Amino acid sequence: VYDFAEDKNKRLWIATMGFGLFYYDLKTKEFTSIQSRTSLINEWIGCLHYSDDNKLYVGTYDGINCIDLDSPDFQSHKILSQNVIYSIFEDDEGVVWLGSSEGLSGWNKNTKELTTYTTADGLPSNTIYAIQGDGKDFLWISTNAGISQFQKKNNKFINYYVSDGLQGNE
């Protein structure tokens, strides 16, 4: 089991490596597999994010799915494929940020636009392990080559390394 996310219906979603997606109903205390009810890109799931609009973002080893939990058959839509997704973070503007093996991607839920940032844009590495917002229009990003602060307003990265005081870059 790699991650959990609780939805508004008191279901605890469970990400597994190789066994797909499950949920545990906190009211009935029953487990349910939804492998046969969705079209997940991949059953190797590393991270989950539950959004207030009742969507579950499922980060897999081959991209990300967005599952509409209001749909009776849990309809799944592919957002980004062919990337290992390590982390998911949603900011206050409704942008879902994805940390992957191929950089940092921001998916705007309203416009459906996907923007990807890589080392060519200033990241120290394209392997993004974690993303966290700080409430000041910045994202903090951990990579396998240091930490970055991403300034969303001007799309700039400030990178921090061992030389700046980190214990290690990874």
Question: What positions do the PLM features span?
Answer:
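Carboxylate-rich, polar loop motifs that coordinate divalent cations or form catalytic acidic clusters
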Residues: V1-E170
